[in-house]
Amino acid sequence: MLLAEHLDGLLEAGLDAVNISLDTTDREQYQAITGMDELERVMASVRLAAGKLPVKINCVVQRGVNEDAPAPLAALARDLPVDVRFIELMPIGAAKDMQTVPNAEVLGRIEERIGKAEEDPGPRGSGPAVYRRLKGFSGRIGFISAVHGQFCGTCNRLRLTSTGELKPCLCYGDRVPLREILRDGAEDKAERIRERILEAVRIKPAAHCFDDREKITENREMARIGG
């Protein structure tokens, strides 16, 4: 919400891209999801940022909450050069008992209202998103199918949490502490950090277990994990 008023300062500080979480373009729905009537401020930030740097808009579709949101959100990419990405709900924390909406269903809802979305011919980035283009659109739509499109074999991610820990995988509770080293003034700090990073890479699991929820060991919510 504060991006618009701070954008110039962030650009001067070196910001070269931004991700914005937005689960709906409907004002009442936005207020129900976030508890705040601030959709217009968020949209103002999207429009302003889209003219100055690469923007990714991230949406999580929840069954019974915002199932009608994908097409209006995708439509933002018609006139704005943004990537609108749909991320499957990962069943961790409070979401463990929620039903994930498959991205195949999300794509179907978009194509039903807007038209065929062709695979983007451009090179894939280093992340898990798969992009498509809608005819006449300035931007793209993307899909991160964390549950139904398992991409663990090519995952190159570690997550630095809000409490200074490295998580190899969001599905499991395993984490490697970094905070005490970061706050330490020892001369060998850099080497110790490197060792912890390598440890996190070594314990990275071969695959998540979102299809067998009893095996999920991460009980914290995404808002607490951060990163």
Residue ranges of model-derived segments:
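Radical SAM/AdoMet-radical enzyme domain recognition
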Residues: 1-87
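Auxiliary Fe-S-binding modules of radical SAM enzymes
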Residues: 71, 78-79, 89-227
